[in-house]
């Protein structure tokens, strides 16, 4: 997996993509700016990727010199880091994946249920807490079994609008 990930990243860079690995870039439009941070998935956490509580992550490099006054969007693979990101004062909007609703989701009476709830407090969709938002995308892939039951492939389009 590490070799294939390195190959994907190399191909993305060859296409001119700016791969955000523990780094922040700034998006400017007119006189406004927002910061966009990408956090790498630490290979040391691979064996803990389903644990609800992770050891403290070193976020200092990714957010170095990011002004607190700027709206920050953070992209991170595993949603369990959201608490640490928020506690550090970042991630006004955090985008995550990884869970895929464990490839099974049942919708009943306007609610969704999944085996993912057994492992994760936050496992799919939007969560708002303390003035910050986490969005967990169900993605398009699968793990182990090439199937998805009730967890439809998802690509999310988010439109940012200025507060008035």
Tell what function each PLM region has.
Residues 1-164:
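Soluble catalytic domains of enzymes that build or remodel membrane lipids, polysaccharides, and related
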